[in-house]
């Protein structure tokens, strides 16, 4: 497994917090953590930080669908003409063609950005210069925003007369490819055993390109090793500690760390501390039914002291429908695809 480097090919790799390809522009710092070379599709991931008052002006992507997750600080976002005050844990769905821009309101602002379907991730190298530091520069240099154009799928939009009243963050995501903001811990919550899964973005929001979900739980056993033929999984540790097996070895992830698991890579994870929480992006999004077979609806916001039954039997029943090869499981050899071994 590659560590603290982007391998420029489809291979498993792990990045410690702050590692990646860093570009500075003005008092902004963009750290690329994944590119089309690694993802084998037009997509990119980046960590965005900046000084208080640092702004990314209104713009839109013609082809790139963007998802934002607030990691730290307070950010004001303009989304489709409406202002939102974002705080840690908020999630933003930005379909292609949606006008948006943001400003950091304190010195600790940090956003996670994933773009799928276009080359908007190239905008950071266009705007900035390679940068050795791991914190944003204290710079008053003017940024030449005019370098952004359709060649990096990022076109500036003249500021309009949008409303000043703060828009309300949602508690449940709508259906379809529409822009929206979910408040922290909100979304479609489900539970499997003692782990709570919260779907932030389902496949309807991106026309099947990806899903985004939070997972949290206490110390527990490792899930069985498995792999996918076409599915890529992107893991961001937010809290606690998780041990991941990917490819040919184990790696521990701590808050801020990232792991890329491409198709045909045997992998597994285990939560090693109580209240561990991680954010995952899964592409393509047609793997979503797996979580609906595995989980049952859940009204709570934290994992329960007495968990409900773990319904892996339902996954086994529907194995033939899923891009999933189970390499090990407790109590017997891997089941054959499409063959049920337990009753519903």
Where are these regions (language model features)?
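Jelly-roll (double-stranded beta-helix
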Residues: 1-28, 32-43, 55-65, 74-210, ...
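Short glycine-rich catalytic loops that host catalytic nucleophiles or stabilize transition states
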Residues: 50
């Amino acid at each position: 497994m590659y560590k603290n480097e982007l391998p420029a090919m489809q291979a498993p790799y792990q990045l410690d917090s702050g590692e990646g390809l860093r570009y500075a522009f003005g008092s902004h710092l963009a750290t690329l953590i994944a590119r089309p070379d690694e993802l084998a599709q037009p997509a990119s991931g980046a960590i965005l930080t900046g000084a208080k008052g640092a702004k990314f002006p209104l713009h839109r992507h013609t082809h790139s669908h963007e998802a934002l997750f607030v990691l730290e600080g307070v950010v004001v976002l303009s989304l489709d003409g409406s202002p939102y005050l974002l705080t840690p844990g908020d999630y933003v769905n930005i379909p292609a063609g949606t006008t948006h821009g943001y400003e950091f309101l304190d010195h600790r602002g940090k956003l996670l950005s994933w773009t799928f379907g276009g080359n908007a991730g190239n905008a950071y190298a266009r705007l900035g210069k390679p940068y050795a530091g791991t914190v944003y520069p204290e710079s008053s240099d003017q940024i030449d925003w005019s370098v952004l154009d359709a060649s990096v799928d990022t076109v500036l939009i003249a500021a309009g007369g949008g409303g000043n009243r703060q828009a309300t963050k949602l508690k449940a995501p709508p259906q379809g490819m529409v822009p929206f903001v979910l408040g922290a811990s909100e979304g479609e919550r489900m539970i499997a055993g003692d782990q709570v899964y919260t779907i932030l973005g389902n496949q309807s929001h991106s026309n099947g390109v990806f899903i985004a979900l939070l997972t949290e739980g206490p110390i527990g056993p490792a899930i069985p090793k498995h792999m996918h033929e076409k599915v890529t999984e992107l893991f961001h540790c937010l809290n606690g500690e998780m041990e991941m097996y990917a490819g040919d070895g184990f790696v521990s992830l701590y808050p801020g760390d990232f792991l890329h698991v491409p198709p045909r890579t045997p992998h597994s994870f285990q939560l090693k501390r109580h209240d561990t929480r991680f954010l995952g992006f899964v592409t393509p999004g047609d793997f979503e039914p797996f979580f609906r077979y595995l989980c049952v609806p859940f009204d709570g916001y934290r994992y329960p002291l007495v968990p409900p039954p773990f319904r892996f039997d339902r996954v086994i029943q529907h194995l033939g429908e899923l891009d999933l090869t189970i390499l090990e499981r407790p109590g017997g050899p891997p089941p054959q695809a499409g063959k049920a071994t337990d009753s519903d």
